[in-house]
């Protein structure tokens, strides 16, 4: 296991699934670091946007926030077309795009790339070792490639690779965080009530939430504020 000096850091916050100017306003007002826009994804999601809507919203994001476009492209060409149209600060790739295609995105778009990896939730203990081994291999390959800027670990369940609202085994995420120099973003079922425990357990570079700050399917300003307050009151050590 890699060992590094323990450094006190401030965990960054990404509010994902933004759908309106009000959502952006809440995130900026309460001190988020980034906002995510789920764009043209080929799966059912109450938070997905068409590219025109995503572009219009991203144009309203203040400079104090990073705009992250979350996409599930099958090719680098489709990813690059969306990046060109929507113009985010950062792109989050939430698909099994091969390294060669990721490299093409990096070289032609020249913006930071977050690569999402799915961590199966509700796994039996005997299977956890195999899951950790597989994820570590993926993370090491990404790190050695130098193509991506960070990895995001999200919970997968019942064929869904993210947006489940489910928490996965944070010990898995912690073990991955300890083995890589890539910044690790933790997602999956995070909400005001559990985000401090998540940070203490994993020491992530950032935390990501969507449904955890919603009420009846819409961003709740009280929950957004509470989530960010809980994060700011917790320091992780890396």
Curated annotation (Swiss-Prot):
Reactions it catalyzes: N-(5-phospho-beta-D-ribosyl)anthranilate = 1-(2-carboxyphenylamino)-1-deoxy-D-ribulose 5-phosphate
Amino-acid biosynthesis as UniProt keyword: yes
InterPro entries reported in the protein's UniProt record: Aldolase_TIM, PRAI_dom, RibuloseP-bd_barrel, TrpF_fam
Major enzyme class: isomerase
Protein's GO biological process: L-tryptophan biosynthetic process
EC number, as in UniProt: 5.3.1.24
Record keywords, A-Z: Amino-acid biosynthesis, Aromatic amino acid biosynthesis, Isomerase, Tryptophan biosynthesis
Pathway: Amino-acid biosynthesis; L-tryptophan biosynthesis; L-tryptophan from chorismate: step 3/5
Molecular functions (GO terms): phosphoribosylanthranilate isomerase activity
This protein's record includes keyword Isomerase: yes
Highest taxon listed in the record's lineage: Archaea
Pfam families, per database record: PRAI
Record family assignment: Belongs to the TrpF family.
Record protein name field: N-(5'-phosphoribosyl)anthranilate isomerase
């Amino acid at each position: 296991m890699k060992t590094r000096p323990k450094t006190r850091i401030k965990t960054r916050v990404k509010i994902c699934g933004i759908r309106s100017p009000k959502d952006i306003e809440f995130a900026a007002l309460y001190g988020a670091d980034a906002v995510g826009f789920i764009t043209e994804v080929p799966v059912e999601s109450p938070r997905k946007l068409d590219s025109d809507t995503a572009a219009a919203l991203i144009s309203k994001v203040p400079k104090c926030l990073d705009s992250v476009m979350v996409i599930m492209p099958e090719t680098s060409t489709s990813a690059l077309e969306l990046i060109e149209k929507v113009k985010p600060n950062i792109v989050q790739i939430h698909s099994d795009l091969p390294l060669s295609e990721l490299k093409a995105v990096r070289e032609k778009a020249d913006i930071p790339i977050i690569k999402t990896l799915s961590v199966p939730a509700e796994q039996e203990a005997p299977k956890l070792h195999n899951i950790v081994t597989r994820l570590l291999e993926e993370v090491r390959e990404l790190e050695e490639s130098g193509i991506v800027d960070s990895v995001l670990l999200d919970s997968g369940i019942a064929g869904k690779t993210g947006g489940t609202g489910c928490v996965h085994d944070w010990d898995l995420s912690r073990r991955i965080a300890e083995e890589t120099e890539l910044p690790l973003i933790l997602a999956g079922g995070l909400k005001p009530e559990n985000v401090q425990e998540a940070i203490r357990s994993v020491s992530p570079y950032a935390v990501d939430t969507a449904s955890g700050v919603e009420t009846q399917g819409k961003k709740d300003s009280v929950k957004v504020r509470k989530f960010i307050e809980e994060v700011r009151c917790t320091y992780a050590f890396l």
